C-alpha cells in the first residue's frame, strides 16, 4: 500500500512540475509561431520557401501512418464493449441523417451567397483563353470517380490491404466488423479486448510523439504555399477568397452555433477546446492531420468511444461542410466570371450532383478541387476550363475548407452522442469550460489532476469495462489488484519525461 502511495505522490509531483510549463512549450503556440515564420520565409525568400514542401509532406505522411491503428483500436474496443449491437446501426443511421442534412445545407448556403454577392461578376473572362491543360490532371482524376466505384472501394481487397493503403473507410469497415465479432464472441474474447485496450496506450503515446513535429510540418507547408503561389495570387481573386472565408465563418457561428446551442453547448467553447487541431489544420491544409487528436479529445469531452469511432472517420468522407460551401460557391463564381448564364434549373442540377460527388472527398489537400472538377464535368452549363481561374488560390482556400470540416465533425460527434444517449453532459460542460483535465496533442497535461488521473489509469490498469473502473484513490476496491508491470508503466509509459 505504501508503495502505491509513493508512486501516486510521484505522479502528483510530476503534475505540479508540468503545471508550470511556460507558454512557448505549448504545441498551439509553437504551431502559430511556425506558421508566422513560414509566411515570412515564403514572402521574402520565395525560392527557399517553395523548397520547404517536403517538411509539410513528411509530417502528413507521419500522421497518416498512425491513423489506421487509431481508428481500428477506437472503433473495435468501443463496439466490443456494447451490450446492444443494434446500437451500432442506430449510431450509423443517425450520423448519416445528420451528415446528409447539414451537407445539403452547406451546399445551399454556398449557392445562396454566390447569387447574392456574385463574387465573379464583372470579370468578363473568355473560357477559350484559359489554359485547360493546367487542370487536366484534376479533371482526369474526377472522371475516375463514380458512386458505384466509391461504394465498392469501401471493401478492401485483403484484410491487411486496408491498413497498408491507409484508406479511412476501408479501415473503418474492418474495424466495425471486427468489433461486432468481438461483441458476439463475448467472454471468450476478453483477452483480445484487454490486449487492444493495452495497445491504445503506446499508440496514443506515439501520436503525442509525432505531434511534436507539428510545428516543423506547419512551417514547411506554409512556407511552400506563400513561396510558390505568392501573396499576389490572393489579391487578384480577393473577392472570392473573402466571400468564401466570410461564408464559412457565418456557417460555423450561425448554423453550427445554433445547433450547438440547441444541444446545450457553446460553439466558441468547442473551438477553444480543439484549438490545437485547428491550428494544425491551418498550417498543413489537411484535416487528416488532426484526426487522431480530434478523436481523443471528443472521447475526453464525454462522448462514448463507440460513437466517436463511428462518427468522426465516417464524417471525414460524408460530412464536409467547408468543402460543400466551396463547391457551389466556386461553381457559380466560374459561371459569373466567364459570363456563362446559369438558370435556376441548372443550379438545382448542380446542387443534386454536388450532393453525390461531395461524398467520399478525402481529407487531404486538393481533394476539394478534384471533387469540384467531378461536379462541373457533370454540369454542362459551367465550363470546366474555368477552374484554371481558381487553381492558383485553391491552396489558400484549402485551409478554410479543412477547418470548417473539422468543426463540423466535432459538432456532429457531440450531437449524435446526445441523440443516442451516449454523452456525459456534465463532463462535456466542465471540459469545454476549461475546468476538466485535458491531455493535449503534445502529450503534456494541461492541469495537475489530469496527470493524476492518467497515472491512476495506468497504475490500476483501468479500461472501459465496468469491472475495471478505478475507485479513484489508494485503497479503493481495485487497488488490491495492482500488478507489478502496471506500476512500472508509470516510468516507461505515458508519464515518462
From Swiss-Prot:
Keywords of the record: Cell inner membrane, Cell membrane, Membrane, Plasmid, Symport, Transmembrane, Transmembrane helix, Transport
UniProt keyword Transport, yes or no: yes
Domain of life assignment: Bacteria
Transmembrane portions of the chain: 27-45, 60-82, 95-117, 168-185, 205-227, 237-259, 348-370, 374-393
GO CC terms: plasma membrane
Coiled coil location: none
Pfam families tied to this protein: SDF
Molecular function terms, GO-annotated: fumarate transmembrane transporter activity; malate:proton symporter activity; succinate transmembrane transporter activity
Organism: Sinorhizobium fredii (strain NBRC 101917 / NGR234)
Regions of compositional bias (Basic and acidic residues) in chain numbering: 475-484
HAMAP family given in the database record: C4_dicarb_transport (MF_01300)
Its biological purpose: Responsible for the transport of dicarboxylates such as succinate, fumarate, and malate from the periplasm across the inner membrane. This transport system plays an essential role in the energy supply of tropical rhizobium-legume symbionts.
Record localization: Cell inner membrane
Region (Disordered): 466-497
Membrane-related topology note: Multi-pass membrane protein
Listed name of the protein: C4-dicarboxylate transport protein
InterPro entries per record: C4_dicarb_transport, Na-dicarboxylate_symporter, Na-dicarboxylate_symporter_CS, Na:dicarbo_symporter_sf
Keyword Hydrolase: no
An example Gene Ontology biological process: L-aspartate transmembrane transport
Family the entry assigns: Belongs to the dicarboxylate/amino acid:cation symporter (DAACS) (TC 2.A.23) family.
PANTHER family, alphabetized: AEROBIC C4-DICARBOXYLATE TRANSPORT PROTEIN, PROTON/GLUTAMATE-ASPARTATE SYMPORTER
Expression triggers: By succinate, fumarate, and malate. Expression depends on the RpoN sigma factor.
Amino acid at each position: 500500500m505504501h508503495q502505491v502511495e509513493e508512486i501516486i505522490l510521484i505522479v502528483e509531483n510530476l503534475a505540479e512540475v508540468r503545471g508550470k510549463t511556460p507558454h512557448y512549450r505549448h504545441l498551439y503556440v509553437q504551431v502559430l509561431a511556425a506558421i508566422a515564420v513560414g509566411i515570412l520565409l515564403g514572402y521574402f525568400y520565395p525560392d527557399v520557401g517553395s523548397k520547404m514542401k517536403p517538411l509539410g509532406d513528411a509530417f502528413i505522411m507521419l500522421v497518416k501512418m498512425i491513423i489506421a491503428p487509431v481508428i481500428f483500436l477506437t472503433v473495435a474496443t468501443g463496439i466490443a464493449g456494447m451490450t446492444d449491437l443494434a446500437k451500432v446501426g442506430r449510431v450509423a443511421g443517425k450520423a448519416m441523417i445528420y451528415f446528409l442534412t447539414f451537407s445539403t445545407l452547406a451546399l445551399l448556403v454556398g449557392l445562396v451567397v454566390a447569387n447574392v454577392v456574385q463574387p465573379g461578376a464583372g470579370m468578363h473572362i473568355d473560357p477559350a483563353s484559359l489554359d485547360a491543360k493546367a487542370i487536366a490532371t484534376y479533371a482526369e482524376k474526377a472522371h475516375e470517380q463514380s458512386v458505384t466505384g466509391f461504394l465498392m472501394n469501401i471493401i478492401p481487397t485483403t484484410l491487411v490491404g486496408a491498413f497498408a493503403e491507409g484508406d479511412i473507410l476501408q479501415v473503418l469497415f474492418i474495424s466495425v466488423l471486427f468489433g461486432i465479432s468481438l461483441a458476439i464472441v463475448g467472454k471468450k474474447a476478453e483477452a483480445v479486448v484487454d490486449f487492444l485496450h493495452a495497445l491504445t496506450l503506446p499508440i496514443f503515446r506515439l501520436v503525442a510523439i509525432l505531434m511534436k513535429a507539428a510545428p516543423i510540418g506547419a512551417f514547411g507547408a506554409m512556407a511552400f504555399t506563400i513561396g510558390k503561389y505568392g501573396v499576389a495570387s490572393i489579391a487578384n481573386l480577393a473577392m472570392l477568397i473573402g466571400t468564401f472565408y466570410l461564408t464559412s465563418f457565418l456557417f460555423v457561428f450561425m448554423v453550427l452555433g445554433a445547433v450547438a446551442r440547441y444541444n446545450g453547448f457553446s460553439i466558441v467553447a468547442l473551438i477553444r477546446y480543439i484549438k490545437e487541431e485547428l491550428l494544425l489544420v491551418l498550417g498543413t491544409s489537411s484535416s487528416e492531420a488532426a484526426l487522431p487528436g480530434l478523436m481523443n479529445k471528443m472521447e475526453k469531452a464525454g462522448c462514448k468511444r463507440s460513437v466517436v469511432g463511428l462518427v468522426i472517420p465516417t464524417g471525414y468522407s460524408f460530412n464536409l461542410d467547408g468543402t460543400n460551401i466551396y463547391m457551389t460557391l466556386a461553381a457559380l463564381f466560374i459561371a459569373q466570371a466567364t459570363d456563362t448564364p446559369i438558370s435556376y434549373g441548372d443550379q438545382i442540377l448542380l446542387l443534386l450532383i454536388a450532393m453525390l460527388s461531395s461524398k467520399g472527398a478525402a481529407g487531404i489537400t486538393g481533394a476539394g478541387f478534384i471533387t469540384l472538377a467531378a461536379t462541373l464535368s457533370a454540369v454542362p452549363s459551367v465550363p470546366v476550363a474555368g477552374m484554371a481561374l481558381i487553381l492558383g488560390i485553391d491552396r489558400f482556400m484549402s485551409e478554410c475548407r479543412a477547418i470548417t470540416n473539422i468543426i463540423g465533425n466535432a459538432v456532429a460527434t457531440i450531437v449524435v452522442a446526445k441523440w443516442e444517449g451516449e454523452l456525459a453532459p456534465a463532463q462535456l460542460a466542465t471540459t469545454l469550460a476549461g475546468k476538466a483535465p485535458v491531455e493535449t496533442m503534445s502529450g503534456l497535461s494541461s492541469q495537475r489532476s489530469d496527470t493524476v488521473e492518467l497515472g491512476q489509469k495506468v497504475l490500476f490498469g483501468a479500461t472501459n469495462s465496468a469491472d475495471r473502473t478505478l475507485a479513484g484513490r489508494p485503497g479503493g476496491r481495485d487497488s488490491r489488484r495492482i500488478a507489478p508491470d502496471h506500476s512500472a508503466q508509470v516510468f516507461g509509459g505515458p508519464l515518462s519525461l
